[in-house]
Amino acid sequence: MDLFNILFVAPFLDMADSPVFLAEVIISGILTGVMYSLVALGFVLIFKASGVFNFAQGAMVLFAALTLVGLMERGVPVWAALGLAVVVMVVLAVVVERFMLRHLVNQEGIILFMATIGLAFLLEGFGEMVWGSNVKPLDVGIPSESFEIGGVLLNEFDLYAAASGSALVAVLAVFFHYTRIGMALRAVADDHQAALSVGIPLKTIWIIVWSVAGFVGLVAGIMWGSKSGVQFSLSLIALKALPVLILGGFTSIPGAIVGGLIIGVGEKIAEIYWGPLIGGAIENWFAYMLALAFLLFRPQGLFGERIIERV
């Protein structure tokens, strides 16, 4: 009974005793969740349009951020550097389509997955060769002043990050569901050959979706880089995005943001209220335990589609 009280009663009593502190923990979790969601969005876009799990998305986040901060270090103004970084990610999409995807059409998913692993190592190595491997501070002018509302401490950077993530999700949801290009992307994901037979240009569609994923990676890189500096550990954020995808569903854009928020808030609450009771570092494994529970009881995720195949 004592163990039950310690694990399942005491933490909730602590939350009730200090609602202001609880609110700060939740807000901190929301920021982290938005950051996870931005990375997960890149995975969703490519998987939704091509059925490929792009292991290189984390490396794309790193490469986009390295390109931006590298240009700024060489004296390029912020807005010009942003524009050039977008151009670089579009060029990357063209190169990926021309030299990788075009030669792997209709191959097994595992082959495409292995190809993206190779792409991840290529981007990391090329980024290190061109821009160096040291940690680079990134400042694009996003304010980071703190202020209080109702006793709750807020940060302007957190609000900008949350607003950017929400706006990006809304734009992408409209793009996929209400535009001709978006519908073509979904058609390609369902059946490459059928899409080609009705005149949908597969090469163009893949360039578009990888370009958009690159732009999403740039936004994620800006947020993560502004918070903790642009460093090569950014590429490992892909591992944290995987539980987000499992929770939200691999094909759901809203699911990416909801899954990210659940994991971000859950991590912070678990670390603050349960960490002192059962040991620290819960933040490092909480997301994976939650993802495992979803794989056991709801493998398609909160917003994913259950796939039924007749044999």
Which residue stretches match the model-derived regions?
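Transmembrane helix-bundle core of multi-pass membrane transporters
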Residues: 3, 12-15, 103-178, 205, ...
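Alpha-helical transmembrane segments of polytopic integral membrane proteins
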Residues: 40-49, 68, 92-98, 119, ...
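Membrane-embedded helix boundary and interhelical linker motif in transport proteins
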Residues: 14, 27, 49-95, 99, ...
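Hydrophobic core segments of alpha-helical transmembrane domains in multi-pass membrane transport
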Residues: 65-69, 86-92, 117-126, 164-173, ...
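Alpha-helical transmembrane segments within multi-pass membrane transporters and channels
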Residues: 43, 76-119, 126, 258-263, ...
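Helix-loop-helix "hairpin" substructures at the membrane interface of multi-pass membrane proteins
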Residues: 32, 153-233, 253-259
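Transmembrane alpha-helical segments in multi-pass inner-membrane proteins
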Residues: 36, 40, 76-87, 207-217, ...
